[in-house]
């Protein structure tokens, strides 16, 4: 993967994600400064094995800006839970994030801090700082006076009939304190959970009424206790781990433009948490107002996305009635009308500011790319023409590679670049049928087949190559030259050797090495790497089909279990990395079956 330009990356807190060629998220991380953090991935040579592996298979990196590093942690956690990135699972587990847990599975539930999920407990969080969480727990005990002791101490107190120390000083109203019943205590737990779930207004209102009543009755000590509880509740609310109220499910959309290009950013919020971030660029029409641009953007967004219940905006879009009618006509659920909100509350407005910041960042990034990409791509083509002494500009370049599976199933691949950009619709895959495992003979066969398909194509056609690149050295180049002579076509051909990035040309004994920082070398490396990626993708499909057939040979593994195994582990590399315990945990899989599966997968990896 080629790193993004440093100037494109904002110096803001945010969450970044690495994706593979299929768009699967491999890794999610957070940063106080995105530019510095992402830069460290591409400049630091001392990386761990897992990060190096992740970078080797990544094809894209993206990011989302947020208001601060605490919000970055929350969004990072939300996405790790949502997408289960494989590299995050291995590098960071849930113990990095402290939670609040209410042990509802116990007869007398308690509130505690945990870094691991507890069975039969309800969890709240994550929270960014454990020392803040300890303060929060102390405040919650002050408000709800629920049990804090361990199960052993609780049983001892019940057996002895003597409350624990917390109960004796009125800090705990557990049943062992002899001041409350089990039913009354369960009501306290219910109120605590409602408070943690965001239903805080009713509790605050109730406490205020009780405080005023106590003050009116001149019960000043009780009124002071209630006042302290109200202050404690308000402090806890200011530290809530919830991004928005859990009742909020909506799309938050912001649009910014430079009068020629509009950048649209959409945060999809479900149950108070950001689940997805979408970004687009639209061509802005001349003399188009901001409200008209907003309406046009919304229409185009929901041609691509499913419709939400609510859409939250900064401003009122033009033709609001017509826009609302259009969206509701598209809505499958006719019983539910889509609400367009353009007067957001304070909490929603803060999130919209974040959405707008991301839209501005993407617009700036797009502007930089738009101004530089065209110039650099054409500079690389002019450099290639100069260095390779070509008669014409190499507008269409084709690159060829040979791959095989353990010496069998030889195949060839062809990738095409036009004007310095990949043209994936022109990519081709060839099955090579020769008796011996011979890369040179395979390359000759591959090039012959490609050239014969060009015999009826005019040389001025856009489908006719101006330059052919062979992945390999002198032997592969000789095979390609032989194929050109066999078919009778004249197309410039060079071989690119990976060891020193050497270019070999027909009839020349010495290699050509392009300047190390030149755009022309960068383009050739990009073409060669794309050729490897495409060839590897095809071989991976064949390899996995072959290993699937191997799995069917294991006694006790039928079609249903093989499919179950492949659904759990997305690739056979994951099967090899999985432990026997992970595999045997699948329904219907025993330890012996898991051992046979591991043995099969590991034996296959050695072939």
Swiss-Prot record:
One of its GO terms (cellular component) is cytoplasm. InterPro entries: GIY-YIG_endonuc (IPR000305), GIY-YIG_endonuc_sf (IPR035901), GIY-YIG_UvrC_Cho (IPR047296), RuvA_2-like (IPR010994), UVR_dom (IPR001943), UVR_dom_sf (IPR036876), UvrABC_protein_C (IPR050066), UvrC (IPR004791). One of its GO terms (molecular function) is DNA binding. Residues 11-89 form the GIY-YIG domain. One of its GO terms (biological process) is SOS response. It is found in: Cytoplasm. Pfam families: GIY-YIG (PF01541), HHH_5 (PF14520), UVR (PF02151), UvrC_RNaseH (PF22920), UvrC_RNaseH_dom (PF08459). Interacts with UvrB in an incision complex. HAMAP family: UvrC (MF_00203). The UvrABC repair system catalyzes the recognition and processing of DNA lesions. UvrC both incises the 5' and 3' sides of the lesion. The N-terminal half is responsible for the 3' incision and the C-terminal half is responsible for the 5' incision. This is UvrABC system protein C. It comes from Tropheryma whipplei (strain TW08/27) (Whipple's bacillus). The gene is uvrC.
